[in-house]
Amino acid sequence: TGSTRVGKLILKQAAEKVQRVTMELSGHSPFIVFDDVDINKVTDMAIAAKFRNNGQVCISPNRFYIHENKKDEFTKQIVEKTKKLKIGNGLNNDTHLGPLTTKKRLNELELLVDKTKKEGATVLCGGQRPPTFNKGYFYEPTVFDNVKDNFTIMKEEPFGPLIPLLTFK
C-alpha cells in the first residue's frame, strides 16, 4: 500500500462493498547476512531482491544488516555489482532498472537521500539522478554506509533503489 494512510483508504473502499482485503502495511523488510554465507551468492540475491521494479515492491528489503566479519567483502561486492546495473527503458531486455513511478516518488526519494547523508551516512555509489537522463523519473541505485538504526531511512520505507548498510556482531 505504501503507507498506513493509503491502507486505511483501501480498507474504507473495500468495506463499502463488503470485500475481503489482506494488506501488508509497510513491513520494512530486513536483509540479514550472517558470517557463514557465500558472499558472491548473497550479493546476487540482495541485488535481485532489492532492485526488482527499482525497489518499488512492498516486500523489497529496506534494511541490510551485515555481520561485521563479512561487511568489507559484502560492501565491496554489492557496490561493484550495483555500479554495473543498467538504467533505462524497462521494456529493453538489457535494462535492469527503469524509472520510478511518479515525480512525487522521485522527489521523496531525493529528500530521503539528502536526509540520510545529513544524518551521517556515506554514499558509496549512486545517490543522484543519472546525468544522462533528461526526462523521466530515473534515479541511480544507491548504497549507503555508516547508517545507524535511528536514521530516518531505517524508519521510513524508501520505496526505491536505496540500500542502507549496517553491521552486527
Where in the sequence are the language-model features?
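Short acidic-hydrophobic, aromatic-tinged amphipathic segments that line or gate anion-handling sites
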Residues: 33, 165-169
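Short, solvent-exposed loop/beta-turn-alpha elements that line the ligand-binding surface or hinge
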Residues: 154
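Short, surface-exposed loop/turn microsegments at beta-strand edges and helix-strand junctions
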Residues: 157-158
